[in-house]
């Protein structure tokens, strides 16, 4: 086992990068440090005027920005640039999301800089955005989490804070037994001039097993959920015989990693109704179908130990769930507030306990 104790260190990163990865480890602990970026990829602006002639806004002092060659607002930093035309609106004094605003469309056609660092967008019109409203201008690009865990066993994160990441705060896949104690995705206190934290989920667990234990955390200002726990389904694309199928990853951001191994227990889900169909089965053999190796593969050829139920075909739409890679979840004594989307998402057939959490102005 390895313990990384930051002793209160505040790690500030630059450009576009993945701050910390923990891969193929066992009995490791990360504790007592924080992660942030000098120049976030989200551009925070304040509404100065809003009316029939459009919106006038001023970027926050740390935002590096310009009008690009297409005439759009563009934020930039070391090795990156971004021209957002969407955003999330926050109340100036409370840092809560503006009621019933959801994802904003912020068109920048015809943008003009009417005085130093003050811009007028004539096509951006929204009566809900009163002067003083703070908008986090953003794209939906999320290339890197703050912390990435993969193929780890018995991992503990204690007193770790992620103040910003251009993706999830914590992304874990194919891990067994993860404990979060005082892990937070949060602002730097009440006087932090920022209104946002991460570009996506605060914590995200994909195809993990064992137990996910998350407690005593603060999750605020993120552009998605506080926690999302799920497996990764494959869709049956071809039914070759009563034991064999070709199945495919369907989400464009979820492929190229090991979906399962020989002996894994699976079940089948009818996509139209989310009902289980047939009995449980086991993988006898699984091979990448569209690549020579698992890396980069989107399709697998899977042979099952037992015959498939007659209802399971490639005509209707069936997903395969790997039961050997599903976790129990304990989520307790956390605060979730002032975020886009939902508070918590749990998609696991195993025991899930959610208790003593405070949900304060989650917008989804």
Regions found by a protein language model. Give the residues of each.
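Repeat-solenoid scaffold signature
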Residues: 207-221
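Extracellular beta-strand-rich solenoid/capping regions of secreted or surface-exposed proteins
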Residues: 1-3, 12-31, 36-54, 141-153, ...
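Ser/Thr/Gly-rich low-complexity blocks that favor extended beta-strand/coil architectures
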Residues: 13, 37-39, 58-112, 255-295
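Small/polar beta-strand repeat architecture
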Residues: 90-142, 277-329, 337
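Surface beta-strand/loop "capping" patches
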Residues: 27-32, 42-54, 236-261, 265
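Long amphipathic alpha-helical scaffold regions
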Residues: 175-211, 238-254, 356-364
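Short glycine/acidic-rich loop motifs that flank beta-strands on beta-rich extracellular proteins
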Residues: 13-19, 39-43, 143-146, 166-172, ...
